[in-house]
């Protein structure tokens, strides 16, 4: 990604592939029940209360849980089921729910972000008599902020909460039981084709045969991939203290230096004339409306490669309208000393950050936390600001 305001590099160390773990898994020394118990232990789960199903990915786990909850509701009542999802959920959740809605199998409500988090009060206000499931991830998929799952679970009052908790599990944030009725975890490798659908046994019993009869991946379990996931969780977890430090610094900096925004709802071509939008503010000619509920981004434009990375960002998040400014202008207006310019430029132009990169980022974040912006760039008139 192309700016210091993406947490993929700052937030946690990326787990490395362990070829020896894959070989150990191929040896088949441990039965499947061993991994079920060990992964439950790593999450602080009581084996008497939780059960684990291994799937081909977290995407399959998410889709399977949503389908089971919707089908159960349709079998039991004449009402069309209602699903609550948070803004910035993984595509496997949003696309599944939207596809069901197009088929008139369910209706849904998207909870917008407030201060980069899902507000439990907004979740409570969205509850309807036919609400059958809420899907709120442990970390926001866009800016990687923590969601208050425990508070959200309380306001749901018995409505099942499904959560994608890969980041929380890998970082060791869950000390005792995931604050959700069901949860999904990816392989931490992607290409190994293994994921987890975990759930409370009472939820599983309520779903009945639907949770098993929905067509889970056929064939024998991917024991080598499951073993590699287990080894990653036990050996490669980053320091939670370091993660929390970076996260707090990042959030303080993000809330303090608000300069350039992308519109949350997008802007139509008809609105351009009324809002004095300059054509130079538009990255390309084929503009579409951006998704609702996404937070703002700060995007820097320096050099040919940076522009290419920006196009990738716009494409990835389906955002087609935004103001792009010059990095030097940003740095000058918020009084960042020139000695830090190279670091920010370096971070912008790298796709993956190393441990040394993270140390350099920490220096910049700590400096930004000690200064007061002067003459910060105002948000464009057509754009929504952070709350």
From Swiss-Prot:
Keyword Protein transport on entry: no
Cofactor names: pyridoxal 5'-phosphate
Broad class of the protein's primary localization: virion
Transmembrane spans: none
Coiled-coil intervals, chain numbering: none
Any one annotated GO CC term: virion component
Location(s) in or outside the cell: Virion
Binding sites annotated in the UniProt record for pyridoxal 5'-phosphate: 58-59, 184-186
Pfam families membership: Aminotran_5
Disulfide-bond pairs as recorded: none
Induction: Expressed in the late phase of the viral replicative cycle.
Keywords carried by this UniProt record: Late protein, Virion
Alphabetized InterPro entries for the sequence: Aminotrans_V_dom, PyrdxlP-dep_Trfase, PyrdxlP-dep_Trfase_major, PyrdxlP-dep_Trfase_small
PANTHER family membership: CYSTEINE DESULFURASE, CYSTEINE DESULFURYLASE FAMILY MEMBER
Family, per entry: Belongs to the class-V pyridoxal-phosphate-dependent aminotransferase family. NifS/IscS subfamily.
Name of the molecule in the record: NifS-like protein
Organism: African swine fever virus (isolate Tick/South Africa/Pretoriuskop Pr4/1996)
Phylogenetic placement of the source organism: Viruses, Varidnaviria, Bamfordvirae, Nucleocytoviricota, Pokkesviricetes
């Amino acid at each position: 990604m192309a700016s210091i305001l993406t947490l993929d590099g700052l937030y946690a160390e990326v787990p490395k592939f362990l070829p020896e773990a894959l070989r150990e898994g191929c040896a088949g020394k441990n039965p499947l029940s061993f991994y079920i118990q060990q992964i439950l232990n790593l999450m602080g789960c009581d084996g008497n209360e939780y059960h684990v199903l291994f799937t081909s990915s977290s995407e399959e786990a998410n889709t399977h849980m949503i389908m089971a909850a919707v089908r159960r509701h349709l079998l039991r009542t004449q009402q069309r089921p209602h699903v609550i999802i948070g803004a910035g959920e993984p595509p496997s959740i949003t696309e599944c729910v939207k596809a069901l809605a197009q088929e008139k199998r369910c209706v849904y409500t998207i909870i917008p972000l407030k201060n980069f988090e899902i507000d439990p009060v907004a979740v409570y206000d969205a509850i309807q008599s036919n609400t059958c499931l809420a899907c709120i991830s442990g970390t926001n998929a866009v800016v990687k902020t923590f969601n208050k799952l425990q508070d959200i679970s309380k306001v749901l009052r018995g409505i099942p909460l499904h959560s994608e908790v890969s980041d929380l599990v890998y970082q060791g944030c869950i000390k005792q039981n995931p604050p959700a009725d069901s949860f999904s975890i990816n392989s931490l490798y992607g290409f190994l084709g293994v994921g987890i659908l975990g759930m409370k046994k009472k939820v599983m019993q309520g779903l009945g045969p639907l949770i098993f009869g929905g067509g889970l991946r056929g064939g024998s379990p991917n024991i080598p991939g499951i073993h590699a996931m287990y080894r990653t969780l036990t050996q490669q977890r980053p320091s939670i203290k370091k993660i929390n430090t970076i996260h707090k610094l990042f959030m303080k900096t993000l809330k303090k230096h608000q300069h350039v925004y992308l519109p949350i709802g997008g802007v139509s071509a008809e609105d351009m004339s009324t809002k004095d939008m300059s054509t130079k503010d538009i990255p390309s000619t084929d503009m579409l409306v951006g998704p609702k509920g996404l937070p703002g981004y700060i995007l820097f434009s320096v050099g040919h490669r940076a522009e290419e990375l920006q196009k990738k960002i716009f494409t990835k998040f389906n955002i087609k309208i935004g103001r792009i400014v010059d990095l030097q202008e940003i740095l000058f207006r918020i009084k960042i000393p020139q000695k830090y310019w190279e670091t920010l430029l370096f971070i912008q132009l790298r796709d993956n950050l190393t441990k040394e990169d993270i140390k350099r980022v920490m220096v910049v974040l700590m400096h930004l936390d000690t200064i007061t912006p002067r003459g910060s760039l105002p948000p464009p008139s057509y754009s929504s600001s952070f709350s």
